[in-house]
């Protein structure tokens, strides 16, 4: 294979890897970042992105913030869990019983530090509240 062909293949792969990362960041935003402090857990958790293996997700934490502020946690971080240096307003929805959809949830609000998994300077996984595992 000639050098130009290898360069082309490498460029395509690099472009696809960036697309994959942006999808993970986009999914993180959909699942965890919300701008309004008033959340109805029973309504929001009935969305299909919170259904795992046909079952309602047991727990999900929402970060009440802008995506820009949350993304800043990962500035300069390539691949590791990072604890925020500032506290965030959080709303955690917890399933209260195993029933068919729509599942019932309780809501808990708090202000605390968050731990996120960073990949190539983007948050891709909510890892914890108050400390990193």
Swiss-Prot record:
The active site is at residues 32, 125. It holds the Pfam family RnaseA. The modification Pyrrolidone carboxylic acid is found at residue 23. The keyword Metal-binding does not apply. GO terms for cellular component: extracellular region. Substrate binds at residues 57-61. It comes from the Eukaryota. Its EC number is 3.1.27.-. The keyword Hydrolase applies. It is found in: Secreted. One of its GO terms (biological process) is defense response to Gram-positive bacterium. This is Oocytes ribonuclease. It comes from Aquarana catesbeiana (American bullfrog). The gene is RCR.
């Amino acid at each position: 294979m000639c050098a130009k062909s290898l360069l082309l293949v490498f460029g395509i792969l690099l472009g696809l890897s960036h697309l994959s990362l942006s999808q993970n960041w986009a999914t993180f935003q959909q699942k965890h970042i919300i701008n309004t402090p008033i959340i109805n857990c029973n309504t929001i958790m009935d969305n299909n992105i919170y259904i795992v293996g046909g079952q309602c997700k047991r727990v999900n934490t929402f970060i009440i913030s802008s995506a820009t502020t949350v993304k800043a946690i990962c500035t300069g971080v390539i691949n590791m869990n990072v604890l925020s240096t500032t506290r965030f307003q959080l709303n955690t929805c917890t399933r209260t019983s195993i029933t068919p959809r729509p599942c019932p949830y309780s809501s808990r609000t708090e202000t605390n530090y968050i731990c996120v998994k960073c990949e190539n300077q983007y948050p891709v996984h909510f890892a914890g509240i108050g400390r990193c595992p």
